[in-house]
Amino acid sequence: VIVCAIMLLLLTAYATWLVSRYARPGLWLTVVFAIIGVFAFITWSAAGGLVPVTGLLFGALSLSVPLVFGALGGVIGERVGVVNVAIEAQFLFAAFSSALIASVTGSFFLGLLGAVVAGALVGSVLAVFSIKYLVDQVIVGVVLNVLITGLTSFLHGAILQPHTETLNSPERFPRWPIPFLSDIPIIGPVVFNQTLIVYLMYFIVPLVAWGLYRTRWGLRLRAVGEHPTAADTVGIKVNPTRFWNVLLAGGIAGIGGAYF
């Protein structure tokens, strides 16, 4: 632990030196700092005992999946100029819809599609009120969170609980191990023996990062969010661009809701 603390202090001093020279610390510095910090914490907490590292990493990854999808939805909304505070509402409505559709159809894939549509529907309400009627985006998001929380609680008690066997018994996502990769010690069972939603996360995160900064879609999206007047001047339709991207953000957040 002392060695890790010394290394963290050295990294902090190096980052401070870079900032003092008006240089930007690289991403590698943050990653190394985080790894050493986590290792130091595990070493300290497990002093004199055993820590199941694989189980710890598996639990951390499982808890992070919905947060990642929610963050992706928030990033897209923020970049296009709409503050998406209704991510919790998209999670809840997507989780409810996914469970109901998967139970009725017996297909986890249709349940996932239902979650995407449900998240997009909540996003459409946010888009209509904030873009067309110019209602404060934060207020709309908070109202949607309260509304969907109450609505899903009511529907759960009125529909799902009385018919648990038929309407609240969705098929679970199976785990699909990737050949060879899932056999890697420690990392393999955690990263490469997961469900469809986790694999979608592996795919969507770099796709969104690439799309935002390497495609015409991302350029238009960021232009609308950063300077809508200039974007409108060069012929970009600001409101439709915002509307469809808020729907896209809601659909992505809905995938995180299906994970619940």
Where are these regions (language model features)?
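Hydrophobic core segments of alpha-helical transmembrane domains in multi-pass membrane transport
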Residues: 6-16, 33-42, 149-153, 200-209, ...
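Structural signal for membrane-spanning alpha-helices in multi-pass inner-membrane proteins
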Residues: 70, 74, 98-102, 127, ...
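Hydrophobic alpha-helical transmembrane segments
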Residues: 30, 60, 89-92, 109-117, ...
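Membrane-interfacial amphipathic/re-entrant helices at transmembrane-helix boundaries
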Residues: 1-69, 109
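Helix-loop-helix "hairpin" substructures at the membrane interface of multi-pass membrane proteins
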Residues: 190-260
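Alpha-helical transmembrane segments and their helix-start/interface "positive-inside/aromatic belt" motifs
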Residues: 23-30, 132-146
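Single transmembrane alpha-helix segments in multi-pass membrane proteins
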Residues: 55-104, 110-112, 121-138
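Transmembrane helix-bundle core of multi-pass membrane transporters
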Residues: 149-213, 244
